[in-house]
Amino acid sequence: MDFNLNTLQHFALVFFEITAIVITLAICLLLLAVLYMYIADVTQSRHTIRRNYPVLGRFRYLFEHLGEFFRQYLFAQDREEMPFNRAQRAWVYRAAKNIDSTVAFGSTQPINRPGDFILLNGPFPPLEEEIKPRSAITFGAGYARQPYSTNAFFNISAMSFGALSVPAIRALSRGAHQAGIWLNTGEGAVSTYHLEGGCDLVFQIGTAKYGVRDEHGALSDDKLRAVASHEQVRMFEIKLSQGAKPGKGGILPGIKVTEVIASTRGIPVGQDSLSPNRHTDISCVDDLLDMLHRVRTITGKPVGMKAVIGQAAWLDEFCRRINERGLQYAPDFFTVDSGDGGTGAAPQSLIDYMGLPIQNSLPLVVNKLQEHGLRERVRVICSGKMINPAGVAAALCMGADCVNSARGFMFALGCVQSLQCNRNTCPTGITTHDEELQQGLDPTDKAHRVANYAANLMHEVEVIAHSCGVAEPRLLSREHLLIVS
């Protein structure tokens, strides 16, 4: 018994001695590190804060980094954050999870800021038996050999494979099929992951023409036919510009160009994928009309265009030349992208200041088409920060036939607005190709959330339409909307 006690005492003494030595060494190393940082800070001249406040000044970088993650949870109010505030995101999260999205007590939304909108209710909303189902809309009727019809007015906007991860694309494809909406492929070409869900696809032709380019980078008729041979590819969209970066081509950082993405796009692995700032074969309105007509003739499917509106004088020439050359040269649809649209990577000056917001550009395009007698020929789609029912309803009031959203569906997938899209470090696995980070994104579960979000949003837009006094959303018009001035 005494032997065991002595042995335990001996081991305890040895343990404490070793612990004391380790702690002493750690303190010495820490002091040496602090001394090294102090000398380095006071002798360097690049960083003023570190020179004036050696060692302590280094905490600035730590706090800046942590602020990206904690600011939205600890300091921001419900309606403060940009580009999307907590109230906007929370509605999407609840809709995607198919849980109660009602709120209590009163609104936190200010209604007196110039540029904001107010939806105008009608005195006699339709009764339940007077409500109509969503009407269908057809693209390319009378001009495309295979026109496309849908009754969905809310769809998934362009997000390319490369900007998004494999599980994100798979979830969007499956969810779009469940909800009966389309998925725009973005400019990164169509992949097997887009096709596997069985949803309708809109193939976007970007300035680099990924997926439909020949060895010289020009548009290939044979590859167009190959893409059009997929029954799921319902329409084609020629991208002129993007809301977050008008006049700048697409940017996919080399860190996100994996082997499968490089193979899909036809580019080198690991190198930055930089698209031209415009189509090399489109330098005027007539070139654009020729391209629209060519793609429709080859594919037999509806063909439209996507553009951010800034200088608007070209729209008159665009409409005039269509009437002069014939309606077969008109786009089957015109996607108006807001100047505050989203992106995976873009210069901040373009994100912040370039291009008109949708509340200015959408009515402008609709008015121009009406003035030139083209509104019935050209369907109008819009995109840009419309992730909640009220925003979608407002766009329908302003004249849109359909509304597309990209970031709304990213929130449905689980996006937490960490602003890491361009770093390949997205914590939710949506915009990263790090397989460890992708493990948290289950395509099967997230597909249900994508479908729930689309269904719940369209249902609530129907509720708004009924409050405005019309039987279904496509009957909304400008008399149902007030812009605060």
Please name every model-derived segment.
Residues L274-Q438:
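Glycine-rich phosphate/ribose-binding loops and adjacent secondary-structure elements
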Residues C415-R478:
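Active-site or pore-adjacent capping/gating segments
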Residues H230-R265, L419-E436, V461:
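Mobile "lid/hinge" segments at catalytic clefts and subdomain interfaces of large enzymes
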Residues R213-L240, P357, N367, V378, ...:
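Phosphate/diphosphate-binding loops
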Residues F203, K209-G211, G254-S283, G344-Q359, ...:
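Glycine-rich tight-turn/loop motif centered on a GG-T
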Residues D2-W182, G188-G198, F203-A244, P253, ...:
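Conserved, well-structured core domains of diverse proteins
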Residues G186-G188, K301-K306, P331, R375, ...:
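Flexible, glycine/charged-enriched surface loops at secondary-structure junctions
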Residues V166, R170, A179, H230-V233, ...:
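Internal alpha/beta core interface subdomains
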